[in-house]
């Protein structure tokens, strides 16, 4: 059982360690002109793509889903680009650099949620939905209440994730490029706005694809050079790393980072089910033509991400060997210059010189841009499509809906920049964990049960969904991170760091209880409509494909 809990603790990197890769203290570096030039090349190229995409965005379908004309392979790359963050690249390699084998367990944890998406969600989601996951959740339930709940769940997740990314972006750019924090945050905000405002999903998709290719190429080159150094022998790699690491052979033993099994289980469940409830990831399944391409998307994305996280393990051990043992990368106190999160960046310099260092720094920045662009589009679609067009202004024209979407992009952008500046010196690592917990406690139960449970009713979905969302937020506030570290109280009311285990349970129990006890005529009608929904979800009959999507 202990080993199972240890494996489930794989969620830790994203919600804590990896998030902390770009939220902890940073030491500003000298201006890196190679990195700045390479980043400018990336920006000019992607802005060119945005201009090209803007000429092809003529309808609501084009803006939200790129007309449904993205292939499974392209979408798989874009999903990988949307999901592989700078935090995972720098944070996981730093975790391997400091803790060895535990980093592998943690890096593989990023993949745990994807089989659920592949086998349970991707096909039915594409067959039932159109632009957002709320289309699926409200297929046979009452449109208004369900869309409001889904939009609120999406916006809270997007806001928390976006703040974490913006603060992380500012600190990472300060770290890598030597630019001022506030300039960095504004720069990310402006570029994010331009990609989404003018190019919609088509530009966002290609930015994510390019970023994924660059990141995979950079990580592959680093791993290749590390393995070349040890004669392509993993035995030599591990032997040399153990010889120079302060912990010695202990870096090859698991379990050093897992203390509390309840927190480990809670965090593991948060990542597993949270991944399947992230709105910017779910939105990507509507960019392909049919369910077959949706399945292929997940298959390719999982392959790309699995390959990448294995590379981070090699990069981390390479950093132990080539960076940790090299005094040139240490300060006077013997600590790594810029902190442990610079391990992968220093390794880039060690294996490829200053030019490759510039390339990796630029890729890290590109990584952030790709993630925030996807988040912004997901947030804008929740407001314009779910709330405006289907709740507050039913019958709105496509033009009106797109106008609201673009206004929302501007508002989200300004809010993200302001909050990025305000949260500069705050601990933002908990925000990513809370985003996953809310996605797992609100979005995921409603999506899953709306597609699979015939007895679900609007009353059950509403009460259970809101209970899950509020439980996650309240328990997070009462937990050690916010109640003690941020608010300064002596002892936490809720003893565990992450609430997913409890909030997911509350959500599922609430949905089950309030649906099972719903004997209204409306509830019975919704149950009767499940068969028609089931046939549509299995066959795709009635789904519009391609540009008319």
UniProtKB/Swiss-Prot annotation:
Subcellular location: Cell inner membrane
Gene Ontology MF terms in the entry: acetate transmembrane transporter activity; glycolate transmembrane transporter activity; symporter activity
Cytoplasmic side, ranges: 56-75, 126-145, 206-211, 284-302, 385-403, 451-461, 517-549
One of the GO BP terms on file: plasma membrane acetate transport
Transmembrane segments: 33-55, 76-98, 103-125, 146-168, 183-205, 212-234, 261-283, 303-325, 362-384, 404-423, 428-450, 462-484, 494-516
CDD domains hit by this protein: SLC5sbd_u4 (cd11480)
Protein's membrane topology: Multi-pass membrane protein
Described function: Transports acetate.
Family: Belongs to the sodium:solute symporter (SSF) (TC 2.A.21) family.
PANTHER family: CATION_ACETATE SYMPORTER ACTP (PTHR48086:SF6), SODIUM/PROLINE SYMPORTER-RELATED (PTHR48086)
Protein name (Swiss-Prot/TrEMBL): Cation/acetate symporter ActP
Lineage: Bacteria, Pseudomonadati, Pseudomonadota, Gammaproteobacteria, Enterobacterales
Gene: actP
């Amino acid at each position: 059982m202990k080993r199972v809990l240890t494996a489930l603790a794989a969620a830790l990197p994203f919600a804590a360690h990896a998030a902390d890769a770009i939220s902890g203290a940073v030491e500003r570096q000298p201006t890196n002109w190679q990195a700045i030039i390479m980043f400018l090349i990336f920006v000019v190229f992607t802005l060119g793509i945005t201009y090209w995409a803007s000429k092809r965005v003529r309808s609501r379908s084009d803006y939200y889903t790129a007309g449904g004309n993205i292939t499974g392979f392209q979408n798989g790359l874009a999903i990988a680009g949307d999901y592989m963050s700078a935090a995972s690249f720098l944070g996981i390699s730093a975790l391997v650099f400091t803790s060895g084998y535990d980093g592998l367990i943690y890096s593989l944890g990023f993949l745990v949620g994807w089989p659920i998406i592949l086998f349970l969600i991707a096909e039915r989601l594409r067959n039932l939905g159109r632009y957002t996951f709320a289309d699926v959740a409200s297929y046979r339930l009452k449109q208004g209440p369900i869309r409001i709940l889904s939009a609120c769940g999406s916006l809270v997740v997007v806001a928390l994730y976006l703040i974490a990314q913006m603060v992380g972006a500012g600190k990472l750019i300060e770290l890598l490029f030597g630019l001022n924090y506030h300039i960095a945050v504004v720069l990310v905000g402006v570029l994010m706005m331009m990609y989404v405002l003018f190019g919609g999903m088509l530009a966002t998709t290609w930015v994510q694809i390019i970023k994924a290719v660059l990141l995979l190429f950079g990580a592959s080159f680093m791993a290749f050079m590390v393995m070349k150094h040890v004669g392509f022998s993993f035995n030599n790699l591990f032997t040399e790393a153990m010889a120079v690491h302060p912990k010695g052979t202990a870096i090859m033993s698991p379990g050093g980072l897992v203390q509390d099994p309840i927190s480990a289980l809670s965090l593991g469940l948060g990542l597993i089910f949270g991944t399947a409830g992230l709105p910017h990831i779910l939105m990507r399944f509507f960019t392909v033509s049919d369910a077959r391409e949706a399945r292929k998307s997940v298959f390719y994305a999982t392959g790309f991400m699995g390959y990448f996280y294995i590379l981070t393990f090699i990069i981390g051990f390479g950093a132990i060997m080539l960076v940790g043992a090299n005094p040139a990368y240490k300060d006077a106190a013997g600590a790594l210059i810029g902190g442990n999160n610079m391990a992968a960046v220093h390794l880039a310099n060690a294996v490829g010189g200053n030019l490759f260092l510039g390339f990796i720094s630029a890729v890290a920045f590109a990584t952030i841009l790709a993630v925030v662009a996807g988040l912004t589009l997901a947030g804008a679609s929740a407001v314009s499509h779910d709330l405006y067009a289907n709740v507050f202004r039913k019958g709105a024209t496509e033009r009106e809906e797109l106008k609201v979407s673009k206004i929302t992009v501007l508002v989200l952008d300004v809010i993200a920049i302001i909050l990025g500046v305000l949260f500069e010196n705050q601990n933002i690592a908990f925000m990513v964990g809370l985003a996953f917990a809310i996605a797992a406690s609100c979005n995921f139960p409603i999506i899953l049960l709306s597609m699979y449970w015939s007895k679900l009713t609007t009353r059950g979905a509403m009460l259970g969904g809101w209970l899950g969302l509020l439980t996650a937020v309240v328990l997070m506030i009462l937990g050690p991170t916010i109640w003690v570290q941020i608010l300064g109280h002596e002892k936490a009311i809720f003893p565990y760091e992450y609430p997913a285990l409890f909030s997911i349970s509350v959500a599922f129990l609430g949905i089950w209880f309030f649906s099972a006890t719903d004997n209204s005529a409306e509830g019975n009608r919704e149950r009767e409509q499940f068969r028609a929904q089931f046939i549509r979800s299995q066959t795709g009959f009635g789904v519009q494909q391609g540009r008319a999507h």
